[in-house]
């Protein structure tokens, strides 16, 4: 069980780790994502799940984006700069085949920097996935758009909450520990002491040394939030 969650956590890190896209473009299996109907949720359920990613002091003031047949669209306009949304499997493109399950749900809330610099990439990946692009095509297009300067670069450090206890990080896995994701360009795991990837007792870096490195910091399991609970 511990090994399965460690592997699933690493896959989930790639949901918003553009570094994983750049490292794996051209790799892996073939196949398209399913139609929108396989990823759809009721708006009420998706809003509740998105909000479960962060404490109420943040999520109640955040803008909430939900998935539609056209991609992510604003369902609730917040009064702060946070954006909360529920990521789907294409956020990990072009990662391993099991991240392509339509069952995957990754609630996440981005701070103002992440809202400006990470969310646009997630919105693009959703549109490409819904347009029938393969995981490899999505990875290529995202990398290309970054290279052309059409997607914004991460400014300094961006923070994201992933505290939901209702997340689903793989077809046969549930939630990992609630944690923070810190987007720190060019950071390296050795700066943290080379902690093992998937370790919930110490921070570790995913996509280290790239412009899109993420430091994962697990928090107390008692902070996990179930959708609809506050």
PLM-predicted stretches and their roles:
Residues 30-230:
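Primary mode marks residue(s) on the alpha4-beta5-alpha5 output face of response regulator receiver
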Residues 1-11:
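N-terminal secretory signal peptides that target proteins for export/translocation
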Residues 27:
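An N-terminal RHG(E/S)-centered segment typical of histidine phosphatases
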Residues 13-24:
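Bacterial N-terminal signal peptides
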